Regions:
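Basic/polar N-terminal segments that are highly enriched at the extreme N-terminus
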Residues: 1-14
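Generic secondary-structure signature for well-ordered alpha-helical cores
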Residues: 3, 24-31, 58, 62, ...
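Acidic/His- and Gly-rich active-site-bordering loop/insert found
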Residues: 13-99
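Alpha-helical metal-binding/catalytic segments enriched in His/Glu/Asp
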Residues: 26, 88, 98-137, 222-228, ...
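Short alpha-helical patches at coil-to-helix transitions and adjacent helical residues
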Residues: 50, 85, 103-111, 145-148
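Short coil/turn connectors at secondary-structure junctions
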Residues: 60, 81-86, 123-128, 189-192, ...
């Protein structure tokens, strides 16, 4: 196996057809009639998607760790495994009317990088890890970015476990039901650096004929629960004073 110092890194290219095939296969799990995907977090479809992705990782020789909030970490060993890993990843849960690429691309692109390194016999200095984060979308359970939020200590595991969907099912119960409640404490996982590849979800790059961009900032989100007190009335003819 060669080290990165022994190759011309500018000539290293992934197998685009293989990545595309993986994206299309994952998109069949929860496929909608209009070409989108509905694969809500911690459903049976989410389990199928997780199983498929982890199966690909194992085929690529990666080892798997699942933490207590269901985040998945797929690891390719490096030459110096005492170093914290270089991590990439995203999520594979979707909105009810989601697409094929949001989140999924970030996870599968990471696996494709590992496949390419394997194909070329390249050994990296530090380990490489690919992650998928639980309930990024927040379309079934709130808050959004739950798995990464617990990992980063933005809120507690107990708070996340107690969240329920519209049917009263809890995050903890659903993690247990689909078999993805791991043993590792969230956050007890060192990271040397983290990169996330993502679709733009907008027209700017295409409009400027640019292939790739680097994100310098993202939209911040806050949720508020409000109680409105008053009397129902027609908005047009009803004076506020009355």
């Amino acid at each position: 196996m060669t080290t990165t110092a022994a190759i011309d890194i500018d000539k290293v290219r992934i197998n685009g057809d293989r990545l595309w095939a993986s994206l299309m296969e994952l998109a069949q799990i929860g496929a909608t009639p209009k070409g989108g995907v509905c694969r809500l977090t911690l459903t049976d479809l989410d389990k199928q998607g997780r199983d498929l992705v982890l199966g690909w990782a194992k085929e690529a020789g990666m080892t798997i760790t699942i933490d207590k909030i269901g985040n998945g970490f797929m690891r390719r060993a490096g030459r110096n495994n005492s170093l914290p890993p270089i991590m990439t990843g995203s999520h594979i849960d979707t909105q009810p009317t989601g697409g094929k690429f949001d989140g999924n691309y970030g996870v599968l692109a990471g696996i494709e990088v590992v496949r390419t390194l394997n194909d070329l016999g390249i050994e990296t200095e530090a380990p490489i890890e690919v992650a998928f984060w639980t309930n990024e979308e927040g379309s079934r359970f709130v808050p959004v970015m739950m798995g990464s939020g617990v990992f980063a200590k933005a809120f507690t595991l107990e708070h996340a476990y107690a969240a329920t969907d519209t049917e009263g099912k809890s995050v903890k119960d659903e993690l247990e039901r689909i078999g993805y409640i791991g043993t590792q404490e969230p956050g007890d996982h060192p990271i040397g650096a983290y990169f996330e590849t993502h679709i733009e979800q907008g027209p700017v790059l295409e409009d400027n004929d640019v292939t790739i961009g680097v994100v310098s900032g993202v939209l911040g989100i806050r949720w508020f629960d409000c109680t409105v007190t008053g009397m129902e009335a027609h908005a047009g003819p009803t004076p506020m004073a009355l």
